[in-house]
Amino acid sequence: AYGLGNGKGKTIEERSRIEQAMKLTGISELAERFPHQLSGGQQQRVALARALAPNPELILLDEPFSALDEHLRQQIRQEMLQALRQSGASAIFVTHDRDEALRYADKIAIIQQGKILQIDTPCSLYWSPNHLETAKFIGESIVLPAHRIDKNLVQCQLGCVPIQSTHSDATSGQILLRPEQFSLVNISQNSTACTVSTFEAIVQNIEFRGRTTSVQIAINHHEIWIEMGYMPDLKIGERIDVYLQGRGMFYN
């Protein structure tokens, strides 16, 4: 454990810390192996154990899974997250994978050109970002020029769209919507708590992708892709009703 020094004369307390770190990361059976005898995933576990051995309050992880294949990355990611939580250490996790950040972080800092744009929980960053750049970076988005016609209503290429409350009094700006806000199912029939707007659309394309189906639609000549968890009974060129659930985000 490099954090405790390379010397052979380790104290009982230091050896106890090493054993605990190895147990946390599931590498106790690898104690006598050399580095070249370890797989990529095992090497990552060893690296985390070395970092945890001194009982640090804070650990920096700089894209630790970038060299692993996707299947192994998911497995090691879960194991490391569990070990970190059990150790009680906080971690700064540097990643360019937004899905990874949204899935595992307690809080996310969005940094652009060395400047922190926003620090917040994943949910708040995704649905209530302070900046348009943050909103576009953190998830798939549809951005359209918009003109405010009421406090919580704008006119855009799609039509009239309700927006979230905003501190801005600007009459012109841009509205941002998430593709998953669009649906072929009117949820307002089962719930009165959600704002739902209806638009007429034309089916442009249908792509079956196994677990999901992507449907490309055109609303007032603006094309949008919708991800669905089933294979819809649709035909290209068909006119359908599309429902926008919730409100858009307005930026000036």
Language model segments and positions:
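Residue-level signal for well-ordered alpha-helical positions
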Residues: 71, 137, 188-189
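Short glycine-rich loop/turn motifs that provide flexible caps or phosphate-binding loops at active sites
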Residues: 2, 39-40, 138, 145, ...
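ABC ATPase nucleotide-binding domains
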Residues: 1-133
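ABC transporter nucleotide-binding domain
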Residues: 121-151
